[in-house]
Amino acid sequence: MNKNSSQHSFLRTIILVSTFGGLLFGYDTGVINGALPFMAEADQLNLTALTEGMVASSLLLGAAIGAVFGGRLSDYNGRRKNILILAVLFFAATLGCTLAPNVSVMVISRFLLGLAVGGASVTVPAYLAEMSPAESRGRMVTQNELMIVTGQLLAFTCNAVIGNVLGDTSHAWRYMLVIAALPAVFLFFGMLKVPESPRWLVSKGRKEDALHVLRRIRNEEKAKSELAEVESAFHKEAEMEQAAFKDLAVPWVRRIVFIGIGIAVVQQLTGVNSIMYYGTQILKDAGFETKAALIGNIANGVISVLATFVGIWLLGKVGRRPMLMTGLIGTTAVLLLIGVLSVVLKGSPALPYVVLSLTVTFLAFQQGAVSPVTWLMLSEIFPLRLRGLGMGVTVFCLWIVNFLVGFTFPVLLANIGLSATFFIFVLLGIASVIFVKRFLPETKGLSLEQLEQNFRAYEKTDRNSAEAKVSG
């Protein structure tokens, strides 16, 4: 094996191992959909509507907090060490959920699981972005998105299989939940074999260690030039002293934070998680029987995985802006069709099949365009010293909106119906398209350090034009 192929092979190992954090993210957010009905039984946790909501949403609340603290901890401990800690937390919280004797233990365990999910949603993309060469960063970072949707598909499939095979066993939900312990073990032992991010090593003054890591994943010339680029960017950022929340108020950084929060919120306002969490309920409302709805939900998981493959391929060919715009226009148009046809075809035997085909189309746009661009851009727009903190803040906003969508969707569905609920998401989708068109910069093909220079230059241009207007 020559040196180049050895470097590529090691880079592939790094991607595979670290993205098991994404697999856990996907499985743990998707599994609750099928586990709740079994968990709610009188001889199990005997859930009421309120406690059911608490069990489902406690993970999302934990994820919001985990995103903020996970970002700060990854800046302090390093990306690799942070992922190792998260793997232990994934494992312990999974066992807590699996063995929960009552609602209180379940809610606390789900909250702890959420901390791990939120921490992984920040740390893994940042680690991948910092290990990636600029020309293939898009494909590498979105491997994590692929693992997230694979985890969700795995959850939907396991729910269906266990629900049918062990459906008469009241503790079937415990088998659904415990499966997540296996990838947590793989993540922990796998991360022991991969190196720390060279960019983080530079930030801690460990230049020789950083060069050693870069030589394992780049050729000699690229390793040295990339190290020089990283050092140059870090020295510029060092003027800001230690990263703190007040640094996010620096004008050029404030613009990045605004764009980052906007991207995160836009990704959730499509309503994607209303389908991922309540897909079975949507299909039942459209007219399917429960078993048919469960099978339909697997179709949603399959299309998510296939579309993510397409999205990863597209990121190497198409700019971030046009890809996100196309995805948002597509999701908004599909939701409009669901809203209209749910009224026009109400009571028709064709309606459930129409709604299923439209949810599949919606997820093709979402997972093939919107989600890959979201996670990639969040990982690449922030400067090195603020990357963990910046991603933490933006992903915190993503999880809070996720929590609000997940919490309000079933309430809206029960009170105003399927059509009106989706019309609300259509209006939010139109607002999202306007935001992207107005504010989103193109980042394709630029190194992380070049992106930072562009943001700094934008601030100078903005300031100069403002001064010219005043003097004029």
Question: How should each PLM-predicted stretch be described?
Answer:
Residues 1-215, 237-472:
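Alpha-helical transmembrane bundle of multi-pass membrane proteins
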Residues 217-219:
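Short helix/loop segments within enzyme catalytic domains
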Residues 223-235, 358:
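Short, well-structured alpha-helical segments
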